[in-house]
């Protein structure tokens, strides 16, 4: 019997990153989604193409050996697939984890295989597998909880690969940058050993990798997007050609680098090289990376542990002054009423209907006692006054 992986999320990251890795590692991939058009297309076509983009050109890979199930209509089939799978992964967005947990919990509970299921969430969030794990426990009978870990093991991961805006009419095919990093903690797998997935970097301590990635790649990418949007730029490449915006992005990453170096013991030289490589990657003219796409979901990106408030709050707690990150927060607060982005409309509503103090806490989760609170409050108040 061959290896099988169940992957929740048939979107570009699911097909173009996680699906590619699983396919190249010899897994049959069962995609699970609620989007009828995605599931129908996956079941209609026996292959799709992943085009890897770099400054040297393009390389194509054909992905086969997959099936797809619509969890909206065929949840029992999803549960059955999980009960006999080797790996479950997901790329659905942190807010959707609570919805995929019940079928995963039921699939785990009905397992009879001797080897535990490996569960790895592939989200742009710190501790996403821990979050999913918590929801799975909530959906598991209390009497079965003591034996849960004989049936499943849960490992956090950090993923890094830019998926630009896709061409109209591309269908299942995905364009994606050639660079990738998928780091997964190996400790949870213990003596059983981690699953055999090609090109994953298995580590004992994930936190330095995930914070370095989130507070460099995601912070830099979003900073460029929000400044670019305010300046009327179309793509991240266009934004970073503007010296003023490039300077602001570098300033924000200088602040996050200070935290990464202090907290995780990464050398300043190594972090500087990492920052330089990130700026080069997100500046790639071959990635048609639209600022509205990168900036979308501002409520999530302004939240407590995310790419701006996460590092800024830790720096403030360490007694450091935070300036560039607060300027980036100001730009993010201006990302309002953007077409096809529900959160940007909600951001406008929150800023309009709440006091600066209430909006600050609602948006960032910061309490008044926190050393960063007053700095964020200033930015919220300023943007509120400018947009009245």
Swiss-Prot record:
Q: What residue intervals traverse the membrane?
A: none
Q: Which residue stretches, if any, does this entry annotate as coiled coil?
A: none
Q: Which sites bind NAD(+)? A: 5-16
Q: Where is the active site?
A: 213
InterPro entries, sorted: 6-PGluconate_DH-like_C_sf, 6PGD_dom2, Mannitol_1_phos_5_DH, Mannitol_DH, Mannitol_DH_C, Mannitol_DH_N, NAD(P)-bd_dom_sf
Q: Which Gene3D superfamilies does its entry note?
A: N-(1-d-carboxylethyl)-l-norvaline Dehydrogenase, domain 2 (1.10.1040.10), NAD(P)-binding Rossmann-like Domain (3.40.50.720)
Give the EC number: 1.1.1.17
**What Pfam families does this protein map onto?**
Mannitol_dh, Mannitol_dh_C
Cite the GO molecular-function annotations of the record: mannitol-1-phosphate 5-dehydrogenase activity
Catalytic activities: D-mannitol 1-phosphate + NAD(+) = beta-D-fructose 6-phosphate + NADH + H(+)
| Any one GO BP annotation for this protein | mannitol catabolic process
Output a single Gene Ontology CC term carried by this record.
cytosol
Q: What are the entry keywords?
A: NAD, Oxidoreductase
- Keyword Oxidoreductase assigned to the entry: answer is yes
Which family is this protein grouped under? Belongs to the mannitol dehydrogenase family.
User: What is its biological role?
Assistant: Catalyzes the NAD(H)-dependent interconversion of D-fructose 6-phosphate and D-mannitol 1-phosphate in the mannitol metabolic pathway.
Q: How does it assemble?
A: Monomer.
Q: Please give the name of this protein.
A: Mannitol-1-phosphate 5-dehydrogenase
């Amino acid at each position: 019997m061959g290896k099988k992986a169940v992957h929740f999320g048939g979107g570009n990251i699911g097909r173009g990153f996680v699906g590619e890795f699983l396919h190249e590692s010899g897994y049959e991939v069962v995609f699970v989604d609620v989007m009828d058009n995605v599931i129908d297309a996956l079941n209609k076509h026996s292959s799709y193409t992943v085009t890897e983009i770099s400054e040297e050109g393009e390389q194509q890979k054909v992905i086969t050996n997959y099936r797809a199930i619509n969890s909206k209509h065929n949840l029992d089939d999803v549960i059955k697939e999980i009960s006999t799978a080797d790996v479950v992964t997901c790329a659905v967005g942190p807010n959707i984890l609570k919805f995929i947990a019940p079928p995963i919990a039921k699939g785990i509970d009905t397992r009879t295989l001797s080897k535990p299921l490996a569960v790895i969430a592939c989200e742009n969030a710190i501790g996403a597998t821990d979050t999913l794990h918590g929801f799975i426990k909530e959906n598991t009978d209390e009497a079965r909880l003591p034996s849960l870990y004989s049936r499943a093991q849960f490992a956090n991961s950090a993923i890094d690969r830019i998926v630009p805006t896709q061409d109209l009419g591309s269908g299942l095919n995905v364009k994606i940058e050639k660079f990738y990093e998928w780091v997964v903690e190996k400790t949870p797998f213990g003596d059983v050993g981690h699953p055999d997935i090609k090109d994953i970097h298995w580590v004992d301590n994930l936190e330095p990798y995930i914070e370095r990635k989130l507070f460099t790649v995601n912070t830099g990418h979003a900073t460029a997007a929000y400044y670019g949007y305010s300046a009327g730029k179309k793509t991240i490449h266009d934004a970073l050609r503007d010296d003023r915006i490039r300077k602001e992005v570098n300033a924000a990453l200088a602040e996050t680098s200070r935290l990464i170096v202090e907290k995780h013991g990464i050398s300043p030289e190594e972090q500087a090289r990492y920052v330089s490589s990130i700026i080069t990657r997100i500046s790639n003219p071959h990635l048609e990376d639209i600022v509205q796409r990168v900036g979308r979901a501002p409520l999530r990106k302004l939240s407590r542990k995310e790419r701006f408030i996460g590092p800024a709050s830790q720096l403030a707690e360490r007694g450091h002054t935070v300036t560039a990150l607060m300027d980036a927060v100001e730009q993010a607060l201006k990302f309002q009423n953007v077409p096809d982005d529900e959160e940007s409309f909600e951001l406008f509503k929150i800023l309009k209907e709440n006091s600066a103090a209430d909006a600050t806490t609602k948006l960032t989760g910061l309490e008044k006692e926190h050393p960063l609170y007053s700095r964020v409050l200033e930015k919220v108040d300023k943007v509120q006054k400018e947009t009245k």
